[in-house]
Swiss-Prot record:
Dimethylallyl diphosphate binds at R140, K216, T217, Q254. Mg(2+) 2 binds at D129, D135. The keyword Transmembrane helix applies. Mg(2+) 1 binds at D129, D135. It is a single-pass membrane protein. Disulfide bonds: none annotated. It is found in: Host endoplasmic reticulum; Host membrane. One of its GO terms (molecular function) is dimethylallyltranstransferase activity. It holds the Pfam family polyprenyl_synt. The lineage of its organism: Viruses, Varidnaviria, Bamfordvirae, Nucleocytoviricota, Pokkesviricetes. It comes from the Viruses. This is Trans-prenyltransferase. Binds 2 Mg(2+) ions per subunit.
Amino acid sequence: MLHLIYISIIVVLIIILISYTRKPKYFRITAPRSVALFHGIHPLNPKNYKTFSEEFETILNNAIEDGDFKGQLTEPCSYALRGGKYIRPIILMEIVRACQLQHSFGAPIYPAEAALAVEYFHVASLIIDDMPSFDNDVKRRNKDTVWARFGVAKAQMSALALTMQGFQNICRQIDWIKEHCPRFPDPNQLGALLCTFVSHSLNSAGSGQLVDTPEKTIPFFKIAFIMGWVLGTGSVEDIGMIERAAHCFGNAFQLADDIKDHDTDTGWNYAKIHGKRKTFDDVAQFLQECKKILHGKKIYTSIWNEIFQKVINVALGT
């Protein structure tokens, strides 16, 4: 029932947001930021994982201080967001960067708002996943889960706030592109495309959450990969291949996690069913296919070596 309520609210928001993104080209959908989210390295300069992580942490802190969350939900939302690995927003930002090295439309796109959106969606799913009605977990990232610290009601409202703010961030990203990249082709249509795609992905994630399968993990990587590709002005015709790359990476990520949790997981676990050796081989195979696709689209950069190694390290327990 809770899942259906969330999806219903999201669908209503999508209809509203899409209608606004079809207004005249220079009509602003969102209020401008009171502060810039980040001042630092040029968006097209190469970065390693540590640099990207620190950059996104600055973006996140500035967004929270700028009022992305209001009132009594500020503390639980901030609490949930801090301390993550930020792999999804890093993937999104790197794909945008790599795409623009091949082609751009004037000023480089800085995808800070889109990166926030994918992290907000992901963290909202973690809050719900930890709830007593799902996994009933009281610890995550070596600290109390949101519901255990702030109560079930605030946890539910925080997940909703994160989801709704994520869509707001997508709209803010479109406004940013209109303001800074006047040669970008039809940003209004892009906004409608992104909102529709994200709502579909969140629905898939919610369905996977109900039955505890990898489908609760993969959709958030699809959001990161595809939003990065589209914002980086990658070809719409190639979205299917980018989605396949995201599917492979998401599967590898989930299977590595299953190996790590082999001895403690009480729910469905691929490694328990097929064994650690086969599961590790599958992780390697999925990563290899993902790498092949990214190479083919000329967006495989040095940071992917770090990202892939992090997945392998999870599987190895190192």
